[in-house]
Amino acid sequence: MIYDFENFTGFLSIPDIHRDVAGYLNLVDGHVRRLIDGGPIVGLQQNLNSLDLKLLHEKFVGDGVMFILQVGGEDEADRSSNIRAFCRRLVYLKNHFSKVNAEAMRFMPVADLPQRIRFGITYGTLIELPRTNGTSEYVGFAINIAARLQKYSGNVSFLASARLPHADKWMTQNGFVKVKATQLRGRPNEFVYIDEVDFTNIKKTKDAVLFEEIALPASPASKK
């Protein structure tokens, strides 16, 4: 999973803001981590429970932050359940990001904070490259896809690859639309899931050409 902020470069260009950026990023990072580890989150009266997701690696990638997660579970159904819950939480956070900014107003010296957070998420095999200092780097196609999804359209705040396990069984039932990302660099035939609200809004903009809606057959369970 990779996330970044709308107009983060502009945020960094505010005069003499750099000493305060760390506090802002740590605040956001804490909320994203609590989506995994559990705990209090903005706008919710009760704490989130922890998910069976292990954070293997976190690093800045350009102007975004990459999380490499190991998905736990006894079988594919368990792993799918963990990813489903994580996706729901990511969408919740992006929908309530203004509350994170309201929290940041307590210590930030300026009001012009990034207005939106954007997520790109996928699933796949990565290769671990151990380093002599005891840390590891990771490489693999999944990282490339997540980065491209997160940057694909500035008007979209959440894109999930259809490579997520069993995504076809739960994404469209939970407020997502399956579309083809027609101009995704290197993979113009990649299927992705987009938040239904985002998709409705983007169809009214010039970025509508970035997505091709597909007609899905009715699932066997829905046939009478």
Where are the regions that the model predicts?
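Catalytic NTP-binding/metal-coordinating core of nucleotidyl cyclase/transferase enzymes
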Residues: 1-88
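Intrinsically disordered, glycine/charged-rich C-terminal tails and inter-domain linkers
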Residues: 154-224
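Extracellular/oxidizing-compartment recognition motifs
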Residues: 149
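C-terminal or late-domain output modules
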Residues: 143-144, 185
